[in-house]
Amino acid sequence: MTTITITRPDDWHIHLRDGAQLKDTVRDISRYMGRAIVMPNLVPPAIDTETALTYYDRIKAQVPAGSQFEPLMVLYLTDKTSPDEIRKAKASGKIVAAKLYPAGATTNSDSGVTDLKNIYPALEAMQEVGMLFLVHGEVTDSSIDIFDRERVFIENILSKIVADFPELKIVLEHITTKDAVDFVTQASDNVAATITAHHLLYNRNHMLAGGIRPHFYCLPILKRNTHQQALLAAAASGSKKFFLGTDSAPHAKDKKEAACGCAGSYTAHAAIELYAEAFESVNALDKLEAFASFNGPDFYNLPRNADTITLVKKSWDVPATYPLGDTNVVPIRAGEAIDWQVE
C-alpha cells in the first residue's frame, strides 16, 4: 500500500463561519491541519482588533481535546481602517494579516474597500510593522466578464499596489488563472499565492457541462482547462511562491441548491486528501510537502510544524452531507470516492 509521510500541513485560507456552525467547521479543519488563516468576512465583519480576538476565542473554544490546532487571525480592511488599528492588531500577536475584499466581490464583502487609495495609510502601516496583505483579486465592475475579473484586477490594481509598496508582503489568494500564475512568478519575493484543491482538480466544464452543479460554484469562479493546468504546473513546480489555501467555504445545502445560490465550495472534510489527488495526477507527490507544509509558514515567517501526518492510498466514500450547525453542507466529492486518506 502506498503511503506518504509529510510535515503537518497548514491551511492558509479558510472560512470557519461562526455561531452554531463553528463547532463543525473547526472539527473538520483541526483533524490534521496545524494552523489556519481564518477569514474575517463574518456578519458583522472583524474590522477591528477586539472583534478579531473575540472571534479567536470562540474558535479556540471549539477545538477538540487533544488537537493543537491554532487559528491565525485576519483583520477585515475597510475604507476607514486606521494605521493605529493596524499597529494594535500586529501587537496582539494573534492577528497576522489584513484582508482586502473589494466591496461586493464575494460573500459578506459589502463592508469592503470602495477605493484603494482609502487604505493606502493602512498599507503603509502594514509595510512598516510587517503585517501581511491578503487580497481577493477580482474587480467588481459589472461590465467586466466574470471570467476576466481576476486578470483585470491584476493588470489594473494589483500591479500598482506591488509597485507602490515594494516591501509589503502580499498574498494573492485562491488564484484561478494563468495570468495570476505568471504575475506571481515574475513578481518580487514579497508576492505569493494560495491555490485551492478544487481549482486544481476541476474547471468550469465540471460546473456547467451536462447540467449546472452548484456545489462547484465559488468565487473566483472555476476557469477553463488551460488555466487549471497552469495552476497544477505552478503548485507542482517546487516554487516557494505557491502554497496551500483551501478557501473551504461552507453554505447550507438549501443556500447552494437555490435559484440564486451562494458562492463557496466545502473541502475542509478532506483537504489534504484532495490535494494529494491533484499532485498525483501530475506525478508530483514529492512536491506536496513543500506546497502544503513549508512554503506557507516560510512566507509568513513562522516556524514549520514539528510533527507529521501520514497519507495512505486507500479509497473511501465521501458522505452526501456533513452537519453544519442546525443544517447540512454538501462537500466537494459528495457521494463519490477519494483516493487518499489520512492514517
Curated annotation (Swiss-Prot):
Organism: Shewanella baltica (strain OS223)
An annotated Gene Ontology molecular function: zinc ion binding
Function: Catalyzes the reversible cyclization of carbamoyl aspartate to dihydroorotate.
Protein family (similarity comment): Belongs to the metallo-dependent hydrolases superfamily. DHOase family. Class II DHOase subfamily.
Pfam family, one: Amidohydro_1
NCBIfam families: pyrC_dimer
Origin organism lineage: Bacteria, Pseudomonadati, Pseudomonadota, Gammaproteobacteria, Alteromonadales
Gene: pyrC
Protein name in the entry: Dihydroorotase
UniProt: Zn(2+) 1 binding residues: H13, H15, K99, D247
EC number(s) on file: 3.5.2.3
Reactions this protein catalyses: (S)-dihydroorotate + H2O = N-carbamoyl-L-aspartate + H(+)
PANTHER family from the UniProt entry: DIHYDROOROTASE (PTHR43137:SF1)
Residues forming the catalytic site: D247
Cofactor binding summary note: Binds 2 Zn(2+) ions per subunit.
Top-level EC class as recorded in UniProt: hydrolase
